[in-house]
Curated annotation (Swiss-Prot):
Main location: membrane
UniProt GO molecular function: protein transmembrane transporter activity
Lineage: Bacteria, Pseudomonadati, Pseudomonadota, Gammaproteobacteria, Pseudomonadales
GO biological process: protein transport by the Tat complex
Protein name: Sec-independent protein translocase protein TatA
Membrane topology: Single-pass membrane protein
UniProt organism field: Pseudomonas syringae pv. tomato (strain ATCC BAA-871 / DC3000)
Chain's gene name: tatA
InterPro entries in UniProt: TatA/B/E, TatA/E
Family of this protein: Belongs to the TatA/E family.
Keyword Transmembrane: yes
Function statement: Part of the twin-arginine translocation (Tat) system that transports large folded proteins containing a characteristic twin-arginine motif in their signal peptide across membranes. TatA could form the protein-conducting channel of the Tat system.
Length: 91
């Protein structure tokens, strides 16, 4: 039996109907139903793209001989010290 008997559930249902009203509960039920329907549709749509064949890869064009592809870039620069003003709250 547990803590909540069927009589308790009926009393709770009556209180909920009195507090929220049947119109609001109907709208809530409709919204929940549409949400579940949309979720199922989204789950079904996620499966469809996996079934489609992958597009054929394009043939790679050879790189020009004059420009190497993976050469590291080195930047020659020198750091300069910046004098920042002293904040009043740190003194």
């Amino acid at each position: 039996m547990g803590i909540f008997d069927w009589k308790h559930w009926i009393v709770i249902l009556i209180v909920v109907v009195l507090v929220f009203g049947t119109k609001k509960l109907k709208g809530l039920g409709t919204d929940v139903g549409e949400s579940i329907k949309g979720f199922r549709k989204a789950m079904h749509d996620d499966d469809k793209p996996a079934e489609q064949p992958a597009p054929q890869p394009q043939q790679a064009q050879p790189a020009p001989q004059g420009s190497p592809l993976n050469q590291p870039h080195t930047i020659d620069a020198q750091a300069h010290k910046v004098d920042e003003p002293i904040r009043k709250d740190q003194v």
